[in-house]
Amino acid sequence: VADKVNPRHSAAGFKLYTRPARAPTLKTFMQTAEAYARCLALTRSHYENFPVARMVPRRLQPAVAAVYAFARTADDIADEGVDRPGGAILSTEERLVRLRDFDDALLTSELGKPTPPEWDWIFTAVADTRAKYNLPISLFRDLLSAFTQDVTVKRYATFADLRDYCRRSANPVGRLVLLLHGFNDEKRFVESDAICTALQLANFWQDVAVDWKKGRVYVPQEDWGRFGVTEADFSAATASPGVRQCLRFQVERTRGLFDQGRPLPASLPFPLNFEIRITWLGGSTILDRVAAQDYDSLRARPTLGTLDKVRLLLRGFFSI
């Protein structure tokens, strides 16, 4: 498989069939430009939650912003119960309905048909980005599937179930980033998947107390009995010995996933390799912080300080 592909060609080099496009009118050009501008504004307003966006090459910033706006809006519906700024908090059923509407709008935009006015700017930008970079619609639908699961699923019976959730909630983002940069090969995808899943898991082990307050427990239930853990243990102010042992087990197997993805940055050009390396180091350091607290994420949420972030930047730069 070619390392780098023309976004309008398949990995084998064959030109992909596309329907003949109509010549863009000034109106559609302006609508698309305005859609991207709104996506960029949303992304910039959330730089604290999406710092890697600052390092994206200028030519890719509109496309990355379109992907971010899509994911952010759907996540807000699922997690915050808000489908528009200043809107009322949605019930569980209303969230599911709006997520179905969002999925329908994605499919409608695929056909070049109008989408709901409140989301038209998002799907205008996403449709244009998908066409330019040949991004599979399945990756966007996987994200929506995971957001829908956030509304209805609060416990995970097995680690395999949790991995499947991460496959849809985290891995598509890494694959989209690679595709936007022109990389489309299975080896990089597998390594990216390992990093993205590990990042998602690291966040779970960091946020055990935070998630409990939201009614969620991501620690697989199959491991509770093994370490003598009960659901009530997650409501305590400090972690029991069983919870600590269980989280130690989760942290160690998450490190194994980070190790699987470790070769990825070396196969990528600057600045993408730097971005991925910083991301990898950040997730690994979160696991270090969980371990440094003796695996007690109930007592206090492990975080990275300013000095930690400076060290990550230096390590990321000099390890390339």
What are these regions (language model features)?
Residues 1-26:
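Intrinsic disorder/low-complexity segments
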Residues 26-200, 205, 209-320:
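Catalytic cores of Mg2+-dependent Asp-rich isoprenoid enzymes
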